């Protein structure tokens, strides 16, 4: 029994205390007489560490228990302790069994997982094997196709070679046949020629006699015809001369015929010039508001609207600086009053950078004054060569036939109105310039001359003498650019976005602030460049997927326009000085 030796005792056991500590080691047990033998440790006995104290204490406790009155209780307590230990051992055994069962379930789960992995791996291997077999089958099929294609190509090549050989044999046969036929033909022709020559040699006398008879007969026939014709003409002329009435009638008829032909020719020329001057348009005129018969027949509604339209404001749609606007308004008022009073028109020179509104103001000036306008370019004169003088006279003749008065606008006038003394110009262009100077030597109440140029310093001195007023159109400032941006933004973006069924839409942002910002960024740009910028906004919106013009799109197009303007200024600067009134790089 374990409780006799003090082992596995419960915490509440009575009569048994904790085991006594081990006795201390005797100091003489380690040393003694053996220490002097070379300091080697002495061999230990197997019972040297045995402590008999526990046995003694157990025997003592057993004796006390036998004489104690609690011996039975102690025995019961020992049995209960043994039962408790057995229950604990059974619970541990159950735990061990549960652990074993859990381990078995884990093993089963691991085996199932391993089986699943094995199945998936087998499936994957099977799929890979199937794919590999399919790949091999495809390769075999492709190889078969290639072999079949090579075989077909080889058969086709053999067939082509066979056809070529047959064609060569047929060609050789035909050539041989033609050669033999040619030889036979030559032999036949040679035989016929020999036979004909032999027959002609034998019949030479007969042939010469036939030729002689035919020539004599032809000579006799010709002589008789001449005698007969001379007799007839002589008798007719004698009869005509002797009859003075016939002579007089013939002379009068020929005279009337000559007069009619000459009159018809000149009348046709005069009528053609009249029709061309009244109804046609000169070749030098590129654009005109003057109504022609052909235009009235083609567009009757537009012509009627133009006839019924009232005079417009000369500066409508034209954005200029305040000082320039006041000056050109005075010119427009003076021109309108000149037309009303049927006085002489003044000639005007408008110079400045391109795209500043010179052509637009000329059109507005004509419409405001109730006049017709005609636009020609100086570059069209030089290619006409010798026809330039005639075309120039036709232009001014056509201008003098206008009942409402004509504003003749010459764009890029420096192209042909150059200095005659220093510039190297052709004789034809010099003659055309002289014709222009002749027709503009005096003021007219039929037409008004307006010249536009970027380089007015190249004009001939006689041209400068014919100009009454010079107007300088400069690049727009900050305020003018903002007005231009707002006007073109409204024309090309706002109106298409709010009117009609167009695809253009406009995103939500501050339009006024954006127009002011664009005007600030476009410093140095002309009105035409700002109009092109607005058109590019419209095109960008049309090119987008949803047709919406956003603020970012506008900024992108503005940056592109500014870069393009700077590039143009770099090119202009590279050309060197002497460009007249070209815009300076900003």
From Swiss-Prot:
Membrane association type: Single-pass membrane protein
Any one GO cellular component localisation term in the record: mitochondrial inner membrane
Effect of residue 412 to Q: Abolished ATPase activity without affecting its ability to interact with and inhibit EIF2AK3/PERK
Residue ranges, annotated region (Disordered): 1-55, 111-134
Mitochondrial intermembrane compartment spans: 2-246
Superkingdom of source: Eukaryota
Compartments in which it is found: Mitochondrion inner membrane; Mitochondrion matrix, Mitochondrion nucleoid
Tissue-level expression: Overexpressed in lung adenocarcinomas (at protein level).
EC number assigned by the record: 3.6.1.-
Broad class of enzyme this protein falls into: hydrolase
Residues forming coiled coils: 86-219
Binding-site residues, ATP: 352-359
Location of region: S100B-binding: 290-305
UniProt catalytic activity: ATP + H2O = ADP + phosphate + H(+)
GO molecular function, one term: ATP binding
Residue positions, PTM N6-acetyllysine: 491
The UniProt record lists the keyword rRNA-binding: no
GO BP: any one term: HRI-mediated signaling
Modified positions (Phosphoserine) in chain numbering: 321
UniProt function note: Essential for mitochondrial network organization, mitochondrial metabolism and cell growth at organism and cellular level. May play an important role in mitochondrial protein synthesis. May also participate in mitochondrial DNA replication. May bind to mitochondrial DNA D-loops and contribute to nucleoid stability. Required for enhanced channeling of cholesterol for hormone-dependent steroidogenesis. Involved in mitochondrial-mediated antiviral innate immunity.
Free-text comment about domains: The transmembrane domain and a C-terminal adjacent region contain all information necessary for mitochondrial targeting.
Family: Belongs to the AAA ATPase family.
Descriptive protein name: ATPase family AAA domain-containing protein 3A
Species name: Homo sapiens
Lineage: Eukaryota, Metazoa, Chordata, Craniata, Vertebrata
Gene: ATAD3A
